[in-house]
């Protein structure tokens, strides 16, 4: 497991037209978006799994939908992120596919 520090590069991703900044190359498989950054109008449901390595998260959700996203250089893709109480968004391997 990698320790998350300020040495990781950041990247801004646009999801459904909303910009999110997060850390890249953190070792997570599925991207994690901070609950405080997640729009309250976007649907979520309780995740059917636990997350490991980012501390003890009391509430773990997942986006109810697969969302369209765009990288900083116009790369297009889809994402169904995890949403929980982390201090910063963590971009995972799911965005590298």
Task: Spell out what each predicted region is.
Residues 8, 14-97:
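Aspartic protease
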